[in-house]
Amino acid sequence: GHHGSGNATDLTKQILADPRVASFIQEHSLSQDEIKRSLPKFNQFLVECRKVKEGDASYIAKGYEPILTMNEGYADVTYKETRQLKEQQEQQAIAKRINLVSLPQSYRKITFADIALDDVARVDTFESLVDFVANYPSPDQKGLYIYGDMGVGKSFMLAAMAHELSETKKVATTIIHYPSFTIDVKNGIKDGSVKEQIDAVKQAEVLVLDDIGAEQFSSWIRDDVLQVILQHRMIEELPTFFTSNYSFADLEAKLSNGRQGDETWQAKRVMERIRFLAKEVHLKGVNRR
């Protein structure tokens, strides 16, 4: 009856009075006919907008918001990513470029903003990392060999650098707990995966060898694993960082102490590569743990 059509007109008025709909009609100079054909879509648009606003569970397109677009002669509803979804996807993409091996996954979330600079000793190291990221890629990009006591935040700083590189330069960094890696490689002898494991590490875009010197000494690891990785990265000029409890001199002494007694030459050869790849930095400071 008459009553029903009255309601329909009211609804139409209500729809057309909505500022988002009104401005869309104006922007696309819709004719009366086009407006009429668009009414169901205008209605759908407003219903969906209301659901989004109220956080309605029946709203299907999570992370997308409804928008009006022009189709052939009538309006249509499409969905565009919301800022939150975009940000969420960006965060996931950033985290994906940080490859952690035998290290806590929480390292993915550390950023430069998380680094405590309460300590002058830390500022220089921090600034070197900031510069490295800002200038990446550059022809003379040397990594850092950061050494210092346990718990001063060496790995933490490099995890933050990896995050920054991923976010600002879309660069992938592999951070490896070196002592665990040496055990994995030794175990790889049984299943023939040694070469594969070494290749993955030596080809990483940016590499961090964490806690070098803490591994159980082995001439084979030194000469056929570490040396091979460093040699490749040196020739290909791939940025390489290290953390250690040992200075260059102490690491060299540790690497010389082989079964054959004096293996100074082999140790020197490895150290030459490390020196070529990275600048030695002593991170002093308070234990952060």
Model regions: which residues?
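Dynamic helix-loop-helix/coil hinge segments at AAA+ ATPase domain boundaries and subdomain interfaces
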Residues: 98-125
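N-terminal nucleic-acid engagement/recognition segments and initiation subdomains in replication
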Residues: 1-63
